[in-house]
């Protein structure tokens, strides 16, 4: 690859947080460069449509540049924006959302919401660590390096709660000992709840008795009563291992008086504090009237369903996995809102107009899909089953933009949109959008409803 150093002005950031410039008419994405900066860079990868490069010198520094706090930042793939000030990170994500909506969806929000800010350090309540062994059987524990599958061995992480970060070296030591005895962990992960922190370790095969004893001894010397070790064997379901405890892995939504038990492997938001703010905003956006029938699509464990029910709605949560549906029902009973909720197992990626009709009409709808979005759902919505309001929570601005374009074509107005800084120091963007059914579309609905 080229060793020559080129110099250019940076015009923008791409969706990964890389600086963008053009050289000889060809776009170049430069890691470590910011808009308005003049940088020296070296090409590291050439492609037909664009080149990728790394900044090697900065001749004009942006006011938005800051010093990364983590010593692993240059190599670790866990973060990509530590060199950008927190306020500039939020502004970048806001611009990215607006640009995607306009470019992909051909839509523009009537109102841009103020961002939801969260903590910028030590905010992660769960994380999975990769594990690898080198030829000398030395174990690495950490996150994968940028653009590769190599594991960056870390002894601390600025995004983790300090009590977890402080234990990384001890966890590595345990996994090293087990590897030398013949049991190499596939991965290790932690989950922090309101009562307890769980260390979940996955192995390809069942541990021997001496290895289990080694974990118990290690726990007693390294961890405290606020922890518990779980094991996942042969790709099965994780199970509590040591010690026995009455404490439950759960998170809380205090505004709604909700406790949400969960298990390792369940999807939960990684940032509990920002999740609380997000749930509160979404419930306010829905403007719930008592007795309204509201759908919660991709409902998971009921993160939105239960607060909506507590706010007076009759909620139907729809989720693809039967086990999650069962757990959502349990959570509803636990929180005293099972009479206001119903949960259905359905593959929303196979959604059709017939599927939508089978649900009957909802007054309002919440959509909270994975990164791939909810295209099959939004394209299947049709009169007379169009809800008056849709709130769409997204972790991928490009699929939000695509689906927003479909909803506007179906007679909705994109009333509001904004971001929530759920993933500080990374380029991942959590956003929310509100779609209101236009009056003319509503009249069409009323006419058809009257004929029925």
From Swiss-Prot:
Binding residues annotated for S-adenosyl-L-methionine, in chain numbering: 269, 298, 303, 319, 347, 368
Pfam families: tRNA_U5-meth_tr
Known catalytic reactions: uridine(1939) in 23S rRNA + S-adenosyl-L-methionine = 5-methyluridine(1939) in 23S rRNA + S-adenosyl-L-homocysteine + H(+)
Keyword Calcium recorded: no
The UniProt record lists the keyword Metal-binding: yes
Residues forming the catalytic site: 395
Enzyme class name: transferase
UniProt domain TRAM: residue ranges: 1-57
InterPro entries, alphabetized: 23S_rRNA_MeTrfase_RlmD (IPR001566), MeTrfase_TrmA_AS (IPR030390), NA-bd_OB-fold (IPR012340), SAM-dependent_MTases_sf (IPR029063), TRAM_dom (IPR002792), U5_MeTrfase_fam (IPR010280)
UniProt KW keywords: 4Fe-4S, Iron, Iron-sulfur, Metal-binding, Methyltransferase, rRNA processing, S-adenosyl-L-methionine, Transferase
EC number(s) stated in the UniProt entry for this protein: 2.1.1.190
One GO term of the biological process aspect: rRNA base methylation
GO molecular function: 4 iron, 4 sulfur cluster binding; iron ion binding; RNA binding; rRNA (uridine-C5-)-methyltransferase activity
Residues engaged in binding [4Fe-4S] cluster: 70, 76, 79, 157
Domain of life: Bacteria
Family per record: Belongs to the class I-like SAM-binding methyltransferase superfamily. RNA M5U methyltransferase family. RlmD subfamily.
Functional description taken from the UniProt entry: Catalyzes the formation of 5-methyl-uridine at position 1939 (m5U1939) in 23S rRNA.
Protein name: 23S rRNA (uracil(1939)-C(5))-methyltransferase RlmD
Organism from which the protein derives: Neisseria lactamica (strain 020-06)
Chain's gene name: rlmD
């Amino acid at each position: 690859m080229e060793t020559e150093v080129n110099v250019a002005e940076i015009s923008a950031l791409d969706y990964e947080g890389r600086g963008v410039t053009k050289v000889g008419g060809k776009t170049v994405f430069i890691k470590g460069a910011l808009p308005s900066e003049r940088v020296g860079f070296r090409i590291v990868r050439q492609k037909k449509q664009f080149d990728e490069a790394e900044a090697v010198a900065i001749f004009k520094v942006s006011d938005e540049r800051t010093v990364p706090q983590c010593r692993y930042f240059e190599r670790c793939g866990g973060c990509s924006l530590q060199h950008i000030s927190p306020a500039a990170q939020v502004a970048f994500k806001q611009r990215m959302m607006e640009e995607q909506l306009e470019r992909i969806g051909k839509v523009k929000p009537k109102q841009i919401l103020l961002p939801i800010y969260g903590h910028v350090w030590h905010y992660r309540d769960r994380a999975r660590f990769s594990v690898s062994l080198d030829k000398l059987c030395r174990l690495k524990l950490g996150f994968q390096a940028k653009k590769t599958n190599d594991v960056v061995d870390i002894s601390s992480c600025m995004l983790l709660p300090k009590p977890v970060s402080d234990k990384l070296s001890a966890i590595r030591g345990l996994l090293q000992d087990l590897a030398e005895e013949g049991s190499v962990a596939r991965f290790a992960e932690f989950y922090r709840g309101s009562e307890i922190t769980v260390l979940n370790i996955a192995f390809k095969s069942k541990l021997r008795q001496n290895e289990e004893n080694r974990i118990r001894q290690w726990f007693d010397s390294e961890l405290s009563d606020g922890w518990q070790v779980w094991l996942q064997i042969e790709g099965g379901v994780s199970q509590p291992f040591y010690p026995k405890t009455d404490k439950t892995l759960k998170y809380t939504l205090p505004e709604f008086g909700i406790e949400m038990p969960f298990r390792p492997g369940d999807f939960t938001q990684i940032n509990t504090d920002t999740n609380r703010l997000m749930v509160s905003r979404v419930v306010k956006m829905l403007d719930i009237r008592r007795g309204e029938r509201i759908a919660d699509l991709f409902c998971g464990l009921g993160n939105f369903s239960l607060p909506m029910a507590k706010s007076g709605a009759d909620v139907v949560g729809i989720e693809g996995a039967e086990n999650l549906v069962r757990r959502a029902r349990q959570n509803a009973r636990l929180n005293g809102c099972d009479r206001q909720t119903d949960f259905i197992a359905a593959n929303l990626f196979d959604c059709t107009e017939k599927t939508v009709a089978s649900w009957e009409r909802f007054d309002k709808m919440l959509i909270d899909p994975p990164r791939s979005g909810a295209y099959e759902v939004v394209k299947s919505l049709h009169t007379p089953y169009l809800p008056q309001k849709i709130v769409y929570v997204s972790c991928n601005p490009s699929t939000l933009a695509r689906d927003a374009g479909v909803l506007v074509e179906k007679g909705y107005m994109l009333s509001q949109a904004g971001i929530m800084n759920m993933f500080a120091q990374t380029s991942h963007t959590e956003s929310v959008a509100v779609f209101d059914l236009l009056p003319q579309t509503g009249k069409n609905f009323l006419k058809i409803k009257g004929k029925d």
